[in-house]
Amino acid sequence: MTTITPESLPRHELLGLHARVAADTDQSRVGIAGRVVDETMQTVVLRTASGVAQVPKKGATFEFRLTDEAAAPDNGVGTAFKPAGGETRQTTGESVAYVTVDGGRLLSRPERRSENGVDSKWR
C-alpha cells in the first residue's frame, strides 16, 4: 500500500477517508465532518452523524484524518498531529495525522486526478 502524504493526498482515492470542512466561503458549511462516501468533479459527499452533506470543493478547505502508516512522522509540511482549531477527537489508539488540502487542488474528476498523479510504465 502506498503511504499517503500531504503532497500525494490530492492524487489518492478519497472515498472512505474521514474529512472535515475546515474553512469555506459559506460559513454554514464550516465544521461539517464525516466519512467521504462519494466524490464528483466539483463536490465531496460526506456521511455525517445527521445524514449526508454534499460540499462544493471550490471555496472549501478540507482537513483529512489519516491513520496508521499514512500518519508516519516524516510526512512533512502540511501534516499536523492535532486537528486545526485545537479540538480533541477520540481515536481507537492508532497513529493519526491531519492533512489540510485546498478544495481547488481536488477540482477534477476523481479518476482523472488519481491517474494524472501516478507514474506508469504502461502510458
Swiss-Prot record:
Q: Which reaction does it catalyse?
A: Endonucleolytic cleavage of RNA, removing 5'-extranucleotides from tRNA precursor
Q: Does the keyword Acetylation apply?
A: no
Any single GO BP term: tRNA 5'-leader removal
Write down a Pfam family by its short name. Answer: RNase_P-MRP_p29
Q: Where is this region: Disordered?
A: 73-93
Q: What class of enzyme is it?
A: hydrolase
Cellular compartments per GO CC: cytoplasm; ribonuclease P complex
Asked if Hydrolase is a keyword of the record, the answer is yes
User: Can you name one GO molecular function term for this protein?
Assistant: ribonuclease P activity
* Alphabetic keyword roster: Cytoplasm, Endonuclease, Hydrolase, Nuclease, tRNA processing
Instruction: Write down the EC number.
Output: 3.1.26.5
> Which cell locations does it reside in?
Cytoplasm
Q: Which family does it belong to?
A: Belongs to the eukaryotic/archaeal RNase P protein component 1 family.
Subunit description: Consists of a catalytic RNA component and at least 4-5 protein subunits.
Q: What does this protein do?
A: Part of ribonuclease P, a protein complex that generates mature tRNA molecules by cleaving their 5'-ends.
Q: What is this protein called?
A: Ribonuclease P protein component 1
